[in-house]
């Protein structure tokens, strides 16, 4: 209880004596909750767990008219907040494995895509927030901390990559349902 009181008093003092601190806190909170696409809304969120351990929290942002059954026809943003540290190479390798569940591609494509994804992504630490942006017929753009950290300019890669979370063939159907929850309740998609 004393710790809570001290924290409240300390924060109040910072705000009173350093108003720019308050503005920075509000700006940071606004940036963290702002929609990453124009006119987008949060469709759903969920946590990926493996053997009971939280791996990341996923949040899906979509525009009006999004149809989960035809996700690849719509712009979207997928935000992952990691609960563990991962090397970019490990993320890329696992992504290719998961993409194989979604669709077919050649070994040459797998090699090219894994290399491109490993180069596009940063290593992540617990607490890092990575945002993937999808535009139909285009590649994937990845942002961290509000800046572009990489991209993979291949439309087929992008469709399969976001299919890891959104395709009916995903290895995590429960997480998919959580991500598209608001699109179902809004009557914009059925799966």
Predicted regions and their residues:
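Positively charged n-region of N-terminal signal peptides that target proteins for export
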Residues: 1-3
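Sec/Tat signal peptide C-region and signal peptidase I cleavage site
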Residues: 18-24
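Terminal leader/tail segments of proteins
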Residues: 24-191
């Amino acid at each position: 209880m004393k710790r809570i009181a001290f924290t409240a008093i300390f924060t109040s003092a910072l705000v009173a004596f350093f108003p720019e601190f308050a503005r920075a806190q509000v700006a940071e909170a606004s940036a963290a909750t702002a929609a990453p696409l124009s006119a987008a809304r949060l469709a759903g969120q969920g946590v990926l767990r493996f053997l009971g351990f939280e791996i990341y929290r996923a949040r899906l942002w979509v525009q009006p008219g999004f149809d989960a059954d035809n996700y690849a026809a719509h712009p979207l943003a997928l935000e992952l907040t990691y609960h563990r540290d991962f090397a970019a190479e490990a993320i890329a390798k696992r992504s290719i494995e998961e993409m194989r569940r979604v669709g077919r591609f050649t070994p040459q494509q797998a090699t090219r895509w894994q290399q491109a994804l490993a180069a596009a992504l940063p290593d992540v630490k617990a607490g890092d927030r990575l945002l993937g942006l999808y535009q139909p017929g285009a590649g994937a753009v990845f942002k961290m901390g509000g800046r572009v950290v990489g991209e993979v300019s291949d439309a087929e890669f992008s469709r399969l990559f976001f299919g890891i979370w959104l395709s009916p063939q995903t290895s995590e159907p429960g997480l998919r349902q959580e991500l598209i929850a608001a699109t179902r309740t809004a009557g914009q998609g059925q799966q």
